[in-house]
C-alpha cells in the first residue's frame, strides 16, 4: 500500500477515475506534487488504456500511487466499491485533505472523507445543466453539498452554489484548469502527425465524439442521434472520424445499427492527437463537456474551429454567453443546421470570444494556495478540531 512521505508538508489525497478528470487535473496534480505530500489514487472507473493510460503518458503525469480496482459487476456495485475502497484508503493513509474534480461516480469517494472529518476540496463545483435526467447532475449536487471548499469555474457556477445555500466564504472562482493543460501541451499538439497516420486532409473531415449515457443508452436518443450522424455524412460527403469509446462501440454493435460508410470508428485518441484533429477539422461534433473550454482556448491562440455540442443542455452557459459553440440537440434538422451555422461563422471570421475564465493559465497555483489556506479553517470552523 502506498503511503505519504510524512515530510512535514500537507498530506493531500487526489482521487480520479476517468479520462476527463485526468486531463483537467494534469497541471494541478503536478503543481500539488511540488508543494504538498501528495498521493494520487485511481478508482478504476475507466479501465481501458486508451481511456486512461495513454493520457498519463501524453500529459507527463506519474502513474497513480494507488489503484482501487473499484469496478464491479454493475453500476451499484461499482459505486459502492468506490465509496468503500476510498474510505478504507483514507483510514489507512490519513490524508490532511482530499481533492476531487467534477461530477463522475469517482467523486462520490468524498462521502467517506466527510464521515472521517477530512477537509474536502471540489474543483468544477457549481456546474449545472438543469437536466435532472443526467446522472452527472445528481453527482454534482451531492459532491457540492458534501465538500467543505468549492472551487467553481465561473461566476455562473458560484451563483448556483450560493443559491443552494452553500457558504459563500468557502466558495471561490478559480477558472477552468484546461487552458493551463492545453498551453503546456500546445507545441506537442501542433506537432502531431495524426493526419498523416490516418490519411486525413486538414479541413476535409468532421471529428465526432459521442459517448454520454443519455445519448448512447437511451434507445430513442441513440437512434435519433445516429440517424442524424448518417444524414450528416450524406450531406457533407467527407470522412467522419468517430473517436469511439468501448461502451459506445459495443452499443452500436449490439443494436445492429448500420453507420454510413463515411463514419470511421476509431479507438479513443490520445490528448495531443485528438486536439490536433480538433484544431484542423471542418467541424467538431461532440457531446463532451470539455468542448466549450477547448473551443474557447483554441480561439484565444488563433486556432478557432467550428464546435457543435450534440446535447440539449449545457453546464457551461458562460461559453454560450461568448458564442464559443453551438448547442444542436440530437435530431437531424438541429444537427445539420447547427453544423452549417458553426462552419459559416468561422468562415466569416466570427469565432466568438474566449471565455475569460477558460483562458487563465495559473489555476493550479490558485488551487494550491486555496488548499493550503483552508485546511486549518475547515478543521477549526467545521470539525472544531482545535
Each model region followed by its residue ranges:
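Nucleotide-activated sugar donor-binding and catalytic core shared by glycosyltransferases
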Residues: 1-238, 248-386
Amino acid at each position: 500500500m502506498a503511503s505519504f512521505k510524512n515530510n512535514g508538508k500537507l498530506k493531500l489525497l487526489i482521487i480520479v477515475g476517468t479520462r476527463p478528470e485526468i486531463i483537467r487535473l494534469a497541471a494541478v496534480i503536478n503543481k500539488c506534487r511540488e508543494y504538498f505530500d501528495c498521493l494520487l489514487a485511481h478508482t478504476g472507473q475507466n479501465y481501458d488504456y486508451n481511456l486512461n493510460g495513454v493520457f498519463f503518458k501524453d500529459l507527463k503525469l506519474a502513474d497513480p500511487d494507488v489503484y482501487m480496482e473499484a469496478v464491479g459487476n454493475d453500476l451499484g456495485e461499482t459505486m459502492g466499491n468506490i465509496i468503500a475502497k476510498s474510505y478504507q484508503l483514507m483510514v489507512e493513509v490519513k490524508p490532511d485533505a482530499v481533492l476531487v474534480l467534477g461530477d463522475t461516480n469517482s467523486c462520490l469517494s468524498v462521502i467517506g472523507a466527510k464521515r472521517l472529518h477530512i477537509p474536502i476540496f471540489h474543483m468544477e463545483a457549481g456546474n449545472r445543466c438543469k437536466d435532472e435526467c443526467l446522472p452527472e447532475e445528481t453527482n454534482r449536487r451531492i459532491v457540492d453539498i458534501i465538500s467543505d471548499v468549492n472551487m467553481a469555474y465561473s461566476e455562473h457556477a458560484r451563483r448556483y452554489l450560493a443559491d443552494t445555500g452553500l457558504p459563500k466564504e468557502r466558495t471561490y472562482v478559480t477558472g477552468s484548469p484546461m487552458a493551463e493543460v492545453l498551453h503546456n501541451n500546445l507545441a506537442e499538439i501542433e506537432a502531431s502527425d495524426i493526419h498523416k497516420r490516418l490519411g486525413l486532409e486538414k479541413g476535409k473531415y468532421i471529428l465526432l465524439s459521442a459517448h454520454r449515457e443519455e445519448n448512447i443508452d437511451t434507445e430513442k436518443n441513440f437512434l435519433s442521434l445516429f440517424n442524424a450522424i448518417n444524414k450528416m455524412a450524406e450531406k457533407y460527403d467527407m470522412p467522419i472520424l468517430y473517436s469511439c469509446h468501448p461502451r459506445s462501440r459495443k452499443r452500436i454493435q449490439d443494436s445492429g445499427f448500420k453507420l454510413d460508410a463515411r463514419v470511421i470508428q476509431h479507438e479513443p485518441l490520445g490528448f495531443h492527437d485528438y486536439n490536433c484533429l480538433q484544431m484542423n477539422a471542418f467541424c467538431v461534433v461532440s457531446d463532451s463537456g470539455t468542448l466549450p473550454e477547448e473551443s474557447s482556448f483554441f480561439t484565444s491562440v488563433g486556432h478557432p474551429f467550428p464546435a457543435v455540442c450534440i446535447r440539449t443542455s449545457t453546464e457551461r452557459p458562460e461559453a454560450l454567453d461568448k458564442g464559443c459553440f453551438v448547442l444542436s440537440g440530437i435530431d437531424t434538422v438541429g444537427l445539420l443546421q447547427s453544423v452549417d451555422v458553426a462552419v459559416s461563422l468561422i468562415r466569416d471570421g466570427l469565432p466568438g470570444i474566449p471565455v475569460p475564465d477558460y483562458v487563465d493559465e495559473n489555476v493550479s497555483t490558485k488551487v494550491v494556495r486555496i488548499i493550503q489556506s483552508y485546511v486549518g479553517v475547515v478543521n477549526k470552523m467545521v470539525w472544531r478540531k482545535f
